[in-house]
From Swiss-Prot:
Name of the protein in its database record: Uncharacterized sodium-dependent transporter HI_1690
Family label: Belongs to the sodium:neurotransmitter symporter (SNF) (TC 2.A.22) family.
UniProt cross-references to PROSITE patterns, sorted A to Z: NA_NEUROTRAN_SYMP_1, NA_NEUROTRAN_SYMP_3
GO cellular component terms attached to this protein's record: plasma membrane
Topological relation to the membrane, as annotated: Multi-pass membrane protein
Transmembrane segments: 18-38, 44-64, 101-121, 158-178, 188-208, 228-248, 273-293, 294-314, 316-336, 355-375, 396-416, 433-453
Keywords assigned: Cell membrane, Membrane, Symport, Transmembrane, Transmembrane helix, Transport
Functional summary from the UniProt entry: Putative sodium-dependent transporter.
Source organism of this protein record: Haemophilus influenzae (strain ATCC 51907 / DSM 11121 / KW20 / Rd)
UniProt keyword DNA damage present: no
Location(s), subcellular: Cell membrane
Keyword Acetylation: no
């Protein structure tokens, strides 16, 4: 990174920024959530709709958040502040509510996201120690019993592994934006790609893999419905970390010479490519060994260990696979944490070290532990009929993210207006900018409203 005249650091290159954003958006969205949703929703039909949705709503919204973030180059709250407009024009202070909603959504997702990271560490350690023995083929019952014993019924074990994951995040974040986040993604993202490509090559060459590839790539058009498309549109927000300040915060470190249109398109396509590769990593092996692809959220943790137990060097590939999941989770978690840390630093004039400790410990105590206990010792505790874990997921993903994203689109279309166009004026795509602006102003809010209403019912 370099430092500009406002003493705010900037990414050292577009590649560094794109790698960081890719890390922020890949996470469990591409490696865990995308594959099981494909399995539940018609295979190729879901993949096709996801690619369309990335163009319809994903890339336009990436550009929205990039414009907001780079405009003032501040935290995700002050990005909606009264100094956003040129010539001293003021705006309502209530727009900052969007920033606070984004922070609340970030807290909600991290409350359960870090727990999933703890699950992955648990599996890696169990594979290495032999507690999860896949040296010989295992049955569905064995895989389920292991999951129930070590994930479902061992809250203190998961609390320990989640804390371990938090500590790894702390080590990276404590080194700052330059020495921590930027440097880590330079190594972690290439490593993730190497692991991912290696697993894809291994699995698409299995006997019978073509059946899985066909399921994955050949759309069943009878499965495509308006309801499914609305659902997929909503999943793109999760996949791209839209609506809770991540892209606003990361783009605030972009220099003014960077082409925001290029970075938005590259970000969207990078996320899509990684998600699609994750499917190639999983579905051929499922069909090779006759495992149903519609296992839902437990697909990775219950079905895939069965697959690995049938493979030559299955333990090695299982460790690589869960290592890949851990890297994806880590590159996302450090950037979501950074949204809150940056806000605390700039809003409360808090030193970075104190902001990191407050953020990580606060989420661990108020979010991670309740989410873990909510599926065990506190399983009778419900919030609006949902477990604590599921409530965090629902409230952040279905309500807060959607409302914040809706507000961002309206903010750019009706408040920033010409200022948003000026932020893109250094590019040569004047026609595209006009189309994008009107699309964001009139079409995107309607799409988000439809998704939001659909999520509620």
């Amino acid at each position: 990174m370099t430092t500009n005249n406002k003493q705010r650091q900037t990414w050292s290159s577009r590649l560094t920024y794109v790698m960081t954003v890719a890390g922020a958006t890949v996470g469990f969205g591409a490696t865990w959530r995308f594959p099981y949703l494909v399995g539940e929703n018609g295979g190729g039909a879901y993949v096709l709709l996801f690619c369309i949705a990335m163009i319809v709503i994903g890339i336009p919204m990436i550009l929205v958040e990039n414009v907001i973030g780079r405009r003032l180059r501040v935290n995700s709250i002050d990005a909606f502040g009264d100094k956003i407009l040129d010539k001293g024009k003021g705006i309502s202070k209530y727009w900052k509510i969007l920033g606070y909603m984004g922070l609340l959504g970030a807290f909600g997702i991290m409350a359960y996201y870090m727990v999933l990271g703890g699950w992955v560490i648990s599996y890696i350690i169990s594979l290495i120690s032999g507690t999860l023995d896949i040296s010989t083929p295992i049955t569905k019952d064995i895989a389920k019993n292991f999951y129930d014993l070590h994930i479902g019924n061992s809250p203190y074990e998961i609390i320990f592994y989640t804390l371990l994951f938090v500590i790894v995040n702390y080590i990276i974040l404590a080194k700052g934006i330059i020495g921590g986040i930027e440097r880590s993604v330079k190594y972690l993202m290439p490593l993730l790609f190497i692991f991912l490509i290696g697993m894809v090559i291994r699995n698409v060459t299995l006997p019978g893999a073509m059946e899985g590839i066909t399921f994955y790539l050949k759309p069943d058009f009878s499965k495509i419905t308006p309801q499914l498309f609305i659902f997929v549109l909503g999943q793109v927000f999760f996949a791209l970390s839209l609506g809770f300040g991540v892209l606003i915060t990361l783009s605030s470190y972009l220099n003014k010479e960077e082409n925001l249109i290029h970075t938005a398109v590259i970000t969207g396509f990078t996320n899509t490519i990684i998600a699609v590769l994750a499917g190639f990593m999983i579905f051929p092996s499922l069909f090779t060994f006759g495992i149903e692809p519609n296992a839902g959220p437990t697909l990775v943790f219950q079905s895939l260990p069965i697959v690995f137990s049938h493979l030559w060097a299955g333990k090695f590939f299982a460790i690589i696979f869960f290592g890949l999941l851990l890297i994806a989770a880590l590159t996302t978690s450090i950037t979501i944490y950074e949204v809150i840390i940056t806000a605390l630093q700039e809003k409360l004039r808090m030193c970075r070290g104190k902001a990191i400790v407050l953020t990580l410990s606060g989420i661990f105590l108020l979010g991670n532990i309740p989410a873990i206990l909510g599926d065990n010792l506190w399983k009778n505790v419900t919030i609006f009929g949902k477990s604590i874990f599921d409530f965090y997921d629902y409230a952040s993903g279905n309500i807060l993210f959607m409302l914040t994203a809706l507000g961002c689109a309206i903010f750019v279309g009706f408040v920033l207006k010409d200022e948003a166009k000026k932020e893109l004026s250094s590019t040569k795509y004047s026609t595209f900018i006009k189309i994008w602006f009107n699309y964001v102003k009139f079409v995107v809010p309607l799409i988000i409203l439809v998704i939001f209403i659909s999520n509620l019912f």
